Amino acid sequence: MTVDSKPQLQRLAADVDVDLMCRLLEEDGAFILKDLLPLDVVESFNRELDVQMAIPPPKGERLLADKYPPHFKYVPNVATTCPTFRNNILINPVIHAICEGYFQRTGDYWLSAAFLREIESGMPAQPFHRDDATHPLMHHQPLEAPPISLSVIFPLTEFTEENGATEVILGSHRWMEVGTPERDQAVLATMDPGDVLVVRQRVVHAGGGNRTTTGDPRRVVLAYFNSCQLTPFETYRTMPRETVESMTVLGQRMLGWRTMKPSDPNIVGINIIDDKRLENVLQLKATDLPA
């Protein structure tokens, strides 16, 4: 089979039936949603990220950013610093329809992390990997176990072959190990701003190398949704309460400010306090609840 004849990533309209989306995650392991985010939302998000990029890095240890090469810029915690993310993108109904189907065997889910990566010219391609480094438990799950993590990739600039569009190996979620795949086994997730790449747990993928010599860096926000049975990689418990109360109930749930319910046999939930729901003890307000 030649490279051109390989099965490619399915590109779906955002209003396609969610059952088809979930079926593609089980069959192919990934798909692209076209034009999920309106361009005005993308532009607003980019402006907020520009502000964060301009802030000098804090002094002292940075657990992740200090490990990255100079061609690679990183901004963590966009849920706290970017209103467009937490009040729009984080509560997108299509993303949550996918998550509800995807996590139906394990119960509620929440955001594990969301951060910006900006990849400049000269950045080499990543090694092929699975998104399981933050929670090694995932590496030990049997193939038949229900998925407990979902990666959602938001391109905020154009993704091309030249600037390092994500490389995805379809069907690799059924592999026992990552091994040492050849790059021609992968397909390219070329995308425009507003598109979204949805990737099932265990799928082998990599960021491509940025071979461009002119133009802007490739900008992407990576969001990871996990079963509420996994502790999030980023904690949002330090967000100001007034910021949290400017959000919807769904947004608050995603950021760990409400009690969550795993699947049975758990009958009371997790993230509880004094045997009560967290939100009730806090008397937490939300924009979509009566005053």
Curated annotation (Swiss-Prot):
Q: Which cofactor does it need?
A: Fe cation
Pathway membership, UniProt: Mycotoxin biosynthesis
Could you confirm whether the keyword Oxidoreductase appears in this record? yes
| The protein's enzyme class | oxidoreductase
A GO molecular function for this record? dioxygenase activity
> Matching InterPro entries, A to Z?
Phytyl_CoA_dOase-like
Give the UniProt record's GO annotations in the biological process aspect.
alkaloid metabolic process; biosynthetic process
Q: What is its EC number?
A: 1.14.11.38
The protein's job, in short, is:
Verruculogen synthase; part of the gene cluster that mediates the biosynthesis of fumitremorgins, indole alkaloids that carry not only intriguing chemical structures, but also interesting biological and pharmacological activities. The biosynthesis of fumitremorgin-type alkaloids begins by condensation of the two amino acids L-tryptophan and L-proline to brevianamide F, catalyzed by the non-ribosomal peptide synthetase ftmPS/ftmA. Brevianamide F is then prenylated by the prenyltransferase ftmPT1/ftmB in the presence of dimethylallyl diphosphate, resulting in the formation of tryprostatin B.
Q: What is this protein called?
A: Verruculogen synthase
Q: Which organism is it from?
A: Neosartorya fischeri (strain ATCC 1020 / DSM 3700 / CBS 544.65 / FGSC A1164 / JCM 1740 / NRRL 181 / WB 181)
Q: Which gene encodes it?
A: ftmOx1
